[in-house]
Amino acid sequence: MDNFKLSLPGWEIVRCIGSGSSGKVYELKKKDEYGGDFHAALKVISVPGSQKEYDEMLETMSEFAMRAKLREKVEEISGEYRLLGALRGHPNIVNCEDQMIIPHDDDMGWDIYIRMELLTSLPDYVSEHGMNVSDVIKLGTDMCSALEQCRENNIIHRDINPHNIFVSR
């Protein structure tokens, strides 16, 4: 896998299911009280996003200014996910279960954990099941419903693409 160490007691990483410009997403598993497995997705966003970003910032600003800028970015990301609370329960929007902000040992960065329901991406679903015309129409209607809900809450998605469209498992 990679060198990511999970800091969520009771949960274990099953696999990395995706990565993008804002972070990585892992499939998690936890035993429920009856011995069954409960699965979730965990998005991990690191601030700064890379050693390169860290080094470039350190070249152009003081450590104090860098820490303040990074903290501001963490607060911005955290605020975006708090906004998703207004959308919780909408049938066409992924539910975010909880969020944690984990400081790095050097106090010059953070990992943001966002635990959410585990869903199947549209490309994975289509390759496994295919889609007929009525499926495509329903998908379009569901997407419009989700985007309308976002608009009503002044939320702009900024990254709509097939890999960010999900289907219930």
Please state what every model-predicted region is.
Residues 58-86:
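AlphaC helix of the eukaryotic protein kinase fold
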Residues 122-132:
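AlphaC helix of the protein kinase catalytic domain
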Residues 151-168:
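Catalytic-loop of the protein kinase fold
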